[in-house]
């Protein structure tokens, strides 16, 4: 500790690193709490307080020089970005994607089910006529892959994605076959769809 406090640049680095860790845990804990992951939030809060007790006391007592203040502020902002990035990579939970399509020639609901997604579809009416609306459940980490798949199948589809607060009842989560969703590549979607159509026709 004395080595760090005796060297001003070591102190700047220590303040930056400690604050990055502290705010990363703080950001993750806040996001997990809002998403309802109470036990994970509690575990992260333990690490957050541990960093606070061990390091932040030393940091706060050293904010009497301009370089330390800048290091503290920069570490705070980087910590928020790192925390959000980690949570994004973890991609916990599910996403619901609503797709409105006028494409009836391709059986989009069954094609998406064959790719591993849970799909509920129904008829609707828009300004320009009949539409098919699909409510698709996907693990959050595959949200972008699903949206690219839908655009490849119907480039004019209207897509809205949102994260449900809670899922209860039904068979949605069981209807999502994660292995199948993970297995296919978006670039090969046309060949995958053609293969599934051939199998079904037989």
Swiss-Prot record:
It is found in: Cell membrane. Signal peptide: none annotated. The chain crosses the membrane at residues 8-28, 40-60, 66-86. Keywords: Cell membrane, Membrane, Transmembrane, Transmembrane helix. It holds the Pfam family DUF2179. InterPro entries: DUF2179 (IPR019264), DUF5698 (IPR044035), UPF0316 (IPR022930). It is a multi-pass membrane protein. Its main location: membrane. The keyword Protein transport does not apply. It comes from the Bacteria. The keyword Cell cycle does not apply. GO terms for cellular component: plasma membrane. NCBIfam families: PRK04164.1-1 (NF003190), PRK04164.1-5 (NF003194). Belongs to the UPF0316 family. This is UPF0316 protein SH1041. The lineage of its organism: Bacteria, Bacillati, Bacillota, Bacilli, Bacillales.
